[in-house]
Amino acid sequence: MKVSLFITCLVDMFQSNVGKATVELLERLGCEVDFPEGQICCGQPAYNSGYVKDSKKAMRRMIETFESAEYVVSPSGSCAFMFKEYPHLFRDEPAWAEKAQRLADKTYELTDFIVNVLKIEDVGATLEKKATYHTSCHMTRLLGVTDAPMKLLRHVKGLEFTPLPRKHDCCGFGGTFSVKMSQISEQMVDEKVACVEETAADVLIGADCGCLMNIGGRIGRKNKPIEVMHIAEVLNSR
């Protein structure tokens, strides 16, 4: 099975280890992974900031870049959801809307792809840690991926799991929200960190790098001994 990796800006610029873990994991599960070099930002930050015309330039580039892909997989629910939004955003441009729909139909968030396309729940991972899991807003509320991450984490050998209190509360990142509404964002992430501390977990796991950077940054500034890991890194652990 051929998979084209949609790496996302945050992984590309700040968390290349997540990209590496994603590729290694998919290859170990029998996928042939390629990285289309024409990919850029999906356009979400620009679109959410009101720069619709500029964001559509990026969207068209991404549609063309992944046009020949069999499957498109991303280690980010937020960015994968943006691809799913393309058909709606191009609804007044029929030719582009058709191309956008084809892209949307073959795009998956990583855990969703593993569980619902590859039909695998036990990837053979081992991690001797006490962990809790942060549920990201875009991945669950918009993309609709709710069960796949936990189905995979339940099979990680040695992982002691503790539910996160108020797990559906936003961490305060929200892309440009954390910049535009910084004081509110800071309060929200403080509350999220307090919930993480309440679990007494060694590691916080999540599936969106934006959330993990936001929460992890706050954990670091508070000098808390809590490790932050993307779910791709956990599933690739041996």
UniProtKB/Swiss-Prot annotation:
One of its GO terms (cellular component) is cytosol. It comes from the Bacteria. It holds the Pfam family CCG. GO terms for biological process: lactate metabolic process. One of its GO terms (molecular function) is oxidoreductase activity. Is involved in L-lactate degradation and allows cells to grow with lactate as the sole carbon source. Belongs to the LutA/YkgE family. This is Lactate utilization protein A. The lineage of its organism: Bacteria, Bacillati, Bacillota, Bacilli, Bacillales.
